[in-house]
């Protein structure tokens, strides 16, 4: 039972269902993608060194995503855990802020490692994931972090469709 069931949100003339997914890929850059159903609503990337040197820019992005989707639709968030070569305090801090915000709002969080995402899509390495996301979106100008966030959301949604996710 949905705790905060509301009327569907309208965005650019389209009705957004009550279930949405925010997929986040933290690393040297923060890639994010917002899905509803298997349709990609929006995606982007933020550079930690330039845009996140001051946390106000990150908080502004978070407020935008929150107001656009999560506050209204109470969707599911995916956060790639801070593994791999980029193990900085900033990465862990951002993952912590995201998880804390989600838990306080009763939004379930599922962590999925980027390597398992790529394996489930049957792609090899970064270039394979980037090619998959570029082909799926029809956008040849995605960053690697955007591509990983998009692939992560797609894997979750496909598993949800097949009944493998209980949430």
Residue ranges of predicted features:
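Phosphate- and other anionic-substrate recognition elements at nucleic-acid/protein interfaces
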Residues: 1-167
């Amino acid at each position: 039972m949905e705790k905060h069931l509301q009327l569907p949100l309208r965005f650019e003339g389209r009705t957004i269902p009550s279930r949405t997914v925010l997929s986040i890929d933290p690393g040297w850059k923060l890639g994010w993608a917002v899905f509803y159903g298997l349709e990609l609503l929006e995606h982007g990337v933020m550079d930690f060194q330039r845009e996140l040197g001051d946390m106000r820019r990150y908080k502004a992005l978070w407020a935008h995503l929150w107001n656009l989707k999560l506050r209204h639709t109470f969707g599911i968030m995916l956060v790639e855990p801070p593994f791999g070569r980029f193990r900085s305090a900033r990465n862990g801090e951002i993952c912590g802020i995201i998880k804390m915000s989600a838990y306080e709002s009763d939004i379930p969080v599922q962590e999925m490692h980027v390597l398992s995402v790529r394996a489930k899509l049957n792609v090899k390495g970064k270039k394979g994931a980037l090619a998959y996301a570029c082909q799926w979106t029809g956008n040849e100008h995605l960053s690697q972090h955007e591509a990983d966030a998009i692939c992560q959301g797609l894997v979750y949604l496909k598993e949800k469709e097949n009944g493998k996710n209980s949430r």
